[in-house]
Amino acid sequence: MKNINKNSLIIFGYSEILTLALVVNSKLDKVKEFNIIEDDNEDKFFKVVSNFISNKTCLNNVFYSCGPGGFTIIRRIISYVKALKFNKYSRTKFIGLNNLFIIACYLNLKSKINDNIYILSILNYSKDHFVQIYQKKKNFLFSLKCLSDIKNIDLDHIDTYLGTLNLSIQNVHSVYLGANPNEVSFFKNIQIVDRSYILEIIINISDMIENNKISQTNYRNFLEEKFDPLYGKSPSTN
């Protein structure tokens, strides 16, 4: 029997906390979060994610974090979605997401910034601060042009970095996701991400992809079926 529901699985993470969500017909159906460090075992990781999905669930899309973030969680997410693709869901569309792009979309949604505004997207994990610059091009949530590679930068040197792009703290809108928001208190126009709203952004993406509302140009911000991690620095063991 043909499946009449449109189901999407979301696997989001950058730190020790992994968020799983099942979206049915553009509505959030269920959510689970767990700490991958409490039981630091890859088999347990695979089991928890697999148990979240019913064997009878037909998935149209899988949205998953490619990074940047902690090496351990990014490696495990990538390994899991590869296994899912080749073992059970060969017809499912797998769409990798840049965490920095997602939080830039969060700023665009929550602050309703004007066209052509520059966005400094910052993700903090442990002692690392991953950054990327975007520019809003038109009145559309996902119409963000990426202007830089992902960098891992000491925030004390952020103005120097912005200067290489003829920007400064004064003329960018910044958005921050991480455990230490006080470290960006000196930023002008800074928005702190409420992690609970991240799923809202990804569900919006899911809905627009299902309904063919995202142009090929904007689609470049996604990393469909490449399964490439975005570490932002040389891999280690964190």
Regions found by a protein language model. Give the residues of each.
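Oxyanion-binding and handling regions
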Residues: 1-31, 37-38, 95-238
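N-terminal phosphate-binding loop and adjacent alpha-helix
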Residues: 34-51
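Short amphipathic alpha-helical face segments that pack within enzyme cores
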Residues: 44-47, 79, 83, 102-105
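Phosphate/pyrophosphate-binding loops at sites that engage ATP/ADP/AMP, CoA/4′-phosphopantetheine
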Residues: 48-61, 158-170
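Short, well-ordered alpha-helices that flank and scaffold nucleotide-derived cofactor binding pockets
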Residues: 51, 82, 86, 109
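DPxDG-like acidic metal-binding loop motif
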Residues: 61-99
